[in-house]
Design a protein with these regions (language model features):
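Short, small/hydrophobic-residue-rich motifs at membrane-helix boundaries and re-entrant hairpins
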Residues: 1-121, 139-142, 146-163
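Juxtamembrane helix-boundary/capping and inter-helix hinge elements in multi-pass membrane proteins
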Residues: 97-98, 131-133
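Glycine-rich flap/beta-hairpin and adjacent strands of clan AA aspartyl proteases
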Residues: 119-132
């Protein structure tokens, strides 16, 4: 990051940490499962979950591979975050400028999840040790995930919500 972006990001934002990102991923996974599993069970029956096949048919390909790709990329392009990241008030930004990433960066980031998960998830776990909290998918796409420093600032328990 250049000095100006570092100051801007450092003043208001912090890198989203490992556990908050795990929470965001759980939220996203639950949403995808709630939307796709009923259809998969209706089409393939409960035996779908017992199969060793990576793809069991056209419906499986669309719901298990294509739908998540389109949904995630759409949220990233239009909101810079999936519902899980929005829940933790985090967003994806270009690691150099702090601006919205390009579509190319988003595609690299999405495909980078494959690289990050193959060696026993080490590329995902990397977020826990990296000083900028980047997983391998972030490093490949040159992105970082940032969140508001004061995540509870909008929560108010009295009539005075300015404090």
């Amino acid at each position: 990051m250049d000095e100006q972006s570092t100051l801007r990001v450092g003043d208001r934002y912090q890198y989203a940490g490992f556990w908050s990102r795990v929470g965001a991923a759980v939220i996203d996974t639950v949403i995808i499962c709630v939307l796709t599993y009923p259809i998969l069970v209706a089409v393939y029956g409960w035996a779908y979950f017992d199969s060793d096949a990576v793809i069991q048919g056209g419906t499986d390909f669309v719901l298990s591979w294509l739908f998540p790709l389109i949904a995630v990329l759409s949220f990233w392009v239009y909101r810079q975050a999936t519902p899980g990241k929005m829940a933790i008030r985090a967003k994806i930004v270009d690691a150099n400028t702090g601006d919205k990433p390009s579509l190319r960066q988003y595609l690299i980031r999405y495909l980078g999840y494959i690289v990050a998960t193959l060696p026993l998830g080490l590329g995902i776990l990397w977020v826990a040790w990296d000083k900028r909290k980047q997983g391998w998918h972030d490093k490949l796409a040159n992105t970082v995930v940032i969140g508001d420093k004061e995540r509870t600032a909008e929560v108010a328990f009295s009539s005075n919500s300015d404090t």
